[in-house]
From Swiss-Prot:
It is found in: Host cytoplasm; Host nucleus. GO terms for cellular component: host cell cytoplasm; host cell nucleus. Its main location: host cell. Changing L226P: Confers temperature sensitivity. Its EC number is 3.1.-.-. Mn(2+) 1 binds at H41, D108, E119, I120. Its cofactor is Mn(2+). It is an enzyme of class 3 (hydrolase). A motif (Nuclear localization signal 2 (NLS2)) lies at residues 184-247. This is Polymerase acidic protein. A motif (Nuclear localization signal 1 (NLS1)) lies at residues 124-139. The lineage of its organism: Viruses, Riboviria, Orthornavirae, Negarnaviricota, Polyploviricotina. Belongs to the influenza viruses PA family.
Length: 716
């Protein structure tokens, strides 16, 4: 076949085909049929363009041997056969001068007379099958498709064949000749059978052997073979048909498919009630750190040593008092618990050698705060079979809560940059395989955008707290162990820094099952006055424990330092996921990668560098009542990361349900925006399923509010 190609086609065409195959890493000695197909396609493109000009009056004319001085312009711009970069440059130039819409795939020609790009197809199969494959791949109304076959058939968009009869006949004759030449050399059958369809996502895999038998056996009734069934599915027209089928299924099913129009959807109903309260396992934007720079003390890296060193940096401690009581708790017990921590830390400092861990004395205040002996006694079921009124105890319905502004503020803060770096370059992890250049480049760009982000601080804080708590829960099951809440970072100057946010005291932790709960008391430093948003701190008892001197524009200012204390609980499975919060970095990196991939496939080259370095370009960051908010690519990275981190921090059944159900409505709205004319039945039921998840969770309520903003702007 290779010899035939070199004899049959013009050397320039052969050279271009060789170059194209080389570019795609294909060996023309092996892929000889492909070599022939590329040459044929190139020749048809050149013949399509040959002798066609536009005269001074703008009319299309065919000139085979005309006056060389005539002012004629080539009617067709040939794009096929050019180097990819040059081809895209030509296309950009055409689009800029003519206003034509830029195609997503490289077309073959541009017609200056009819102002449209043309995709030429040469097929050894049925023209209409190949035409549909091309149309399906291109998915553009603007690119004109013209298909030729080796049997003299042709097919073009809207039966508009662009060229005159004679020019097309010349192409068909040439194709017929190539076929005859191949047949006479015994090459045609192999060439004809080697054609594969346009490689789109819907590529068909050949199913053979056992799998084929299983496929044929598992078809719905009335289908004799897999091909038969595939043909039916491909030609299936859904509208109207589903309703009929549903009504046959059951007398009770009465599904009318209603068209989903811009006026159809209503906003989600958010619950009324008192404002929602903070429910994260540790403070977020309100946290305060006591820090040491360049730690080099004895025992550096041992949490208790680090904590004591951080505590020593603060000199403003004072007699603590309750400034915001917990409505349902015994507040003096929280106060006594903090005093006990201070006293026991002081005791440690007085010892000759500081221990690696500290178990608190089991005082009455800690027993109360950690729910010691509060669990109902378990009785074997066999021992109480005969009890007449045996029943599960009643649990109250959760109280409905309304959306409060603090959760949006928390989210905004999580997207912001801090002045410290919270992850090293390798936190996201190397690939198992030798990492490709592009992948590592993307990872490094992404890391640079998010390493200083507050959401990244939350990740490292969450990983540390959950790891320490799970370790202590397994290693000291009966002890009330004191666990410092620590994180590590680097300053702008690259100096190491150790931070103390507060302490946790864990309760008894005989955790047999994944869902068994360990109680803990958290005590966290803050400069936030709880009286400003008391509803946010409903679950906390807040003490004033000191005064902190802060540098400001007018000199040093003294601010009260608060301690946020609460009883909380977690389980093995929750701690396991908390330890894996670094996954949030990976999830948001993958979302950014898919954006880069989409951009790269349009431009047909890797756009990673441009994506991160083009500072002038803005991207949609999110929805607000004002409309779609836009920001830099760094802002997009940090927003996606913050969403992923909040999904982890505020994980709950309400979030699971809301995400799953609202996604269905989102897809319907997207279909409407894409002019796919969606239809729905039981839309009311879908709204019900979404709204039953809107109870009291702050993060879910915020997402529902964002969803409403999206609905408003998407359906304008």
């Amino acid at each position: 076949m290779e010899d035939f190609v070199r004899q049959c086609f013009n050397p320039m065409i052969v050279e271009l085909a060789e170059k194209a195959m080389k570019e795609y890493g294909e060996d023309l000695k092996i892929e000889t049929n492909k070599f022939a197909a590329i040459c044929t396609h190139l020749e048809v493109c050149f013949m399509y363009s040959d002798f066609h000009f536009i005269d001074e009056q703008g009319e299309s004319i065919v000139v085979e041997l005309g006056d060389p001085n005539a002012l004629l312009k080539h009617r067709f711009e040939i794009i096929e056969g050019r180097d990819r970069t040059i081809a895209w440059t030509v296309i950009n130039s055409i689009c800029n001068t003519t206003g034509a819409e830029k195609p997503k795939f490289l077309p073959d020609l541009y017609d200056y007379k009819k102002n449209r790009f043309i995709e030429i197809g040469v097929t050894r199969r049925e023209v209409h099958i190949y035409y549909l494959e091309k149309a399906n791949k291109i998915k553009s109304e603007k690119t004109h498709i013209h298909i030729f076959s080796f049997t003299g058939e042709e097919m073009a968009t809207k039966a508009d064949y662009t060229l005159d009869e004679e020019s097309r006949a010349r192409i068909k004759t040439r194709l017929f000749t190539i076929r005859q030449e191949m047949a006479s050399r015994g090459l045609w059958d192999s060439f004809r059978q080697s054609e594969r369809g346009e490689e789109t996502i819907e590529e068909r895999f050949e199913i053979t052997g056992t799998m084929r038998k299983l496929a044929d056996q598992s078809l719905p009734p009335n289908f004799s073979s897999l091909e038969n069934f595939r043909a039916y599915v491909d030609g299936f027209e859904p509208n109207g048909y589903i309703e009929g089928k549903l009504s046959q299924m059951s007398k009770e099913v009465n599904a009318r498919i209603e068209p989903f129009l811009k006026s159809t959807p209503r906003p989600l109903r958010l619950p009324d009630g008192p404002p929602c309260s903070q429910r994260s396992k540790f403070l977020l934007m309100d946290a305060l750190k006591l820090s040491i720079e360049d730690p080099s003390h004895e025992g550096e890296g041992i949490p208790l040593y680090d904590a004591i060193k951080c505590m020593r940096t603060f000199f403003g401690w004072k007699e603590p008092n309750v400034v915001k009581p917990h409505e349902k708790g015994i507040n003096p017990n929280y106060l006594l618990s903090w005093k006990q921590v201070l006293a026991e830390l002081q005791d440690i400092e007085n010892e000759e050698k500081i221990p690696r861990t500290k178990n608190m004395k089991k005082t009455s205040q800690l027993k109360w705060a950690l729910g010691e002996n509060m669990a109902p006694e378990k009785v074997d079921f066999d021992d109480c079979k005969d009890v007449g009124d045996l029943k599960q105890y009643d649990s109250d319905e959760p109280e409905l809560r309304s959306l409060a502004s603090w959760i949006q503020n928390e989210f905004n803060k999580a997207c912001e940059l801090t002045d410290s770096s919270w992850i090293e370059l390798d936190e996201i992890g190397e690939d198992a395989a030798p990492i490709e250049h592009i992948a590592s480049m993307r990872r490094n760009y992404f890391t640079a955008e998010v390493s200083h982000c507050r959401a990244t601080e939350y990740i490292m804080k969450g990983v540390y707290i959950n790891t320490a708590l799970l370790n202590a829960s397994c290693a000291a099951m009966d002890d009330f162990q004191l666990i410092p809440m620590i994180s590590k970072c680097r300053t702008k100057e690259g100096r190491r820094k150790t931070n103390l946010y507060g302490f946790i005291i864990k309760g008894r932790s005989h955790l047999r099952n994944d869902t068994d709960v360990v109680n803990f008391v958290s005590m966290e430093f803050s400069l936030t006055d709880p009286r400003l948003e008391p509803h946010k701190w409903e679950k906390y008892c807040v003490l004033e424990v000191g005064d902190m001197l802060l540098r400001s524009a007018i000199g040093h200012v003294s601010r009260p330092m608060f301690l946020y204390v609460r009883t909380n609980g977690t389980s093995k499975i929750k701690m396991k996921w908390g330890m894996e919060m670094r996954r949030c970095l990976l999830q948001s990196l993958q979302q950014i990668e898919s954006m880069i991939e989409a951009e790269s496939s349009v431009k047909e080259k890797d756009m990673t560098k441009e994506f991160f370095e083009n500072k002038s370009e803005t991207w949609p960051v999110g929805e607000s009542p004002k409309g779609v908010e836009e920001g830099s690519i760094g802002k997009v990275c940090r927003t996606l990361l913050a969403k992923s981190v909040f999904n982890s921090l505020y994980a709950s059944p309400q979030l699971e349900g809301f995400s799953a159900e609202s996604r269905k409505l989102l897809l319907i709205v997207q279909a409407l925006r894409d002019n796919l004319e969606p239809g729905t039945f039981d839309l009311g039921g879908l709204y019900e399923a979404i709204e039953e998840c809107l109870i009291n969770d702050p993060w879910v309520l915020l997402n529902a509010s964002w969803f409403n903003s999206f609905l408003t702007h998407a359906l304008r």
